[in-house]
Amino acid sequence: MDSLHIGSYSFSSRLILGTGKFSNSKVMLEAIRASGSQLVTVALRRFNREQAEDDLFGPLSALEAVTLMPNTSGASTAAEAIRAAHIARQLSGSPFIKVEIHPNPQHLMPDPIETFEAAKVLVNDGFLVMPYIAADPVLAKRLEEIGCASVMPLGSAIGSGQGLSTFEMLKIIIRESTIPVIVDAGLRSPSEAAHAMEMGCSAVLVNSAIAAAGNPPAMAEAFSEAVIAGRKAFQAGLMEQSGEAVATSPLTFLGA
């Protein structure tokens, strides 16, 4: 499989893992290893060296060939996200930042205005900015134009497991983008990850579907294989759909 390029970084895996929701750090690390992921996202609030049970930075730092992508989950304004991003960079040393601003805890939809404002500042501050957004083609293009390293439109609401309910808008974003498009949120099954990759997504980010599975490491491996299969299918080129049946064999008998 070809590499995923974000800024000057290259990753052989196109599966990005979230680190929330796992029952403990041991299961999380097993899932990351099983997935083969080389880019994982972690919330700033999990950089807690004073309380070991809440700290994910220590365990994640021990993983080889894994790059951290801090996120600003919990921020409800651009100012909060900008502050969180700078603290996260100081703690992790990572240039990546996933801008995640959702002021309403009920539906957790990303705020487009605050996200755009935060992204502008953070791009100028030298971050590789990866904003989490609704599947809005206009916003995605504007974020690309100001220098974001990728866009991360949602497949459906965070943690909902509703799959690719934004399918039609995702297709537009993919078609119009010249930066990586990473589907983030809502995926429930490996088949949905494969579908996203078949559409032409650059990568998928998965957390709940793996962390809440009966066997997270096994599910992580299943998602990894699905992402590879979907990418290969996209590169091979899917057949065109038809509104009618198309015969694959002659419809006349021999000698007729």
Curated annotation (Swiss-Prot):
Keyword field: Cytoplasm, Schiff base, Thiamine biosynthesis, Transferase
BP term (GO), one: thiamine diphosphate biosynthetic process
GO CC terms, sorted: cytoplasm
Enzymatic reactions: [ThiS sulfur-carrier protein]-C-terminal-Gly-aminoethanethioate + 2-iminoacetate + 1-deoxy-D-xylulose 5-phosphate = [ThiS sulfur-carrier protein]-C-terminal Gly-Gly + 2-[(2R,5Z)-2-carboxy-4-methylthiazol-5(2H)-ylidene]ethyl phosphate + 2 H2O + H(+)
Domain of life according to the entry: Bacteria
Broad class of the protein's primary localization: cytoplasm
Coiled coil residues, start to end: none
Xref: Pfam families: ThiG
Catalytic residues in the record: K98
Annotated residues for binding of 1-deoxy-D-xylulose 5-phosphate: G159, A185, G186, N207, S208
MF (Gene Ontology): thiazole synthase activity
Subunit structure: Homotetramer. Forms heterodimers with either ThiH or ThiS.
Family: Belongs to the ThiG family.
Protein name: Thiazole synthase
Organism in which the protein naturally occurs: Chlorobium chlorochromatii (strain CaD3)
Phylogenetic lineage: Bacteria, Pseudomonadati, Chlorobiota, Chlorobiia, Chlorobiales
